[in-house]
Amino acid sequence: MNRLMIVSLLGIATALGGCVSPPPKPNDPYYAPVLPRTPLPAAQNNGAIYQAGFEQNLYDDRKAFRVGDIITITLNEKTQASKKANSDIQKDSKTKMGLTSLFGSGMTTNNPIGGGDLSLSAEYGGSRDAKGDSQAGQSNSLTGSITVTVAEVLPNGILSVRGEKWMTLNTGNELVRIAGLVRADDIATDNTVSSTRVADARITYSGTGAFADASQPGWLDRFFLSPLWPF
């Protein structure tokens, strides 16, 4: 194997290695817990029953509605998609050309070796046919729960929530991340809400370790499955 081929293979392997999505990293600042912007004042022992800043509405249901409050999102995601396409292109062509006379004189002569008369004629025919059939299907399901914090309260009362959960297993780490918008009316009395009620949801389920590496195809498999493969 010459040096040029070795360099080419190394270049292809490096390029395909760069196409792999980098593994998720823990402690992403975007998903970090958001603390309340206005912390409660320190309690003053002045002998009074009621302290300023510690008031509580008697009819408050304790549902999350402020920055830093905690909400548990129940994951109930299920998607199923399928696609099928068929194509058939066919083209036939035939051309025939013959000369029987030239300036009023016949162009047909006797064949000196037998087998009929000779004439100036030509005939061409062609046929092309292309067929294609493709089918793709995908089904995903994600169930569980994740507890997040309220990062921002929009002017219309919508809550912007986000958070992550890491689980360390024997063979690696499992990650669940979610971010989106939640209506305060959709939050139950126990501060739970279904993921189907989260608007503009960004849900990530990934991991690192042996299981995550085993589910990734090798660099040669990625080359055969990439658009660079000419066949």
From Swiss-Prot:
InterPro entries reported for this sequence: Flag_Lring
Protein species of origin: Pseudomonas aeruginosa (strain UCBPP-PA14)
Subunit structure: The basal body constitutes a major portion of the flagellar organelle and consists of four rings (L,P,S, and M) mounted on a central rod.
Name of this chain's protein: Flagellar L-ring protein
Record's bilayer topology term: Lipid-anchor
Lipid linkage positions (N-palmitoyl cysteine): C19
Region (Disordered), start-end ranges: 118-141
KW Membrane (keyword) present: yes
GO biological process: one example: bacterial-type flagellum-dependent cell motility
Cellular component aspect of the GO annotation: bacterial-type flagellum basal body, distal rod, L ring; cell outer membrane
Protein role: Assembles around the rod to form the L-ring and probably protects the motor/basal body from shearing forces during rotation.
Organism superkingdom: Bacteria
Lipidation positions, renumbered (S-diacylglycerol cysteine): C19
Location of this chain's protein in the cell: Cell outer membrane; Bacterial flagellum basal body
Signal peptide annotation: 1-18
Any single Pfam family the record assigns to this protein: FlgH
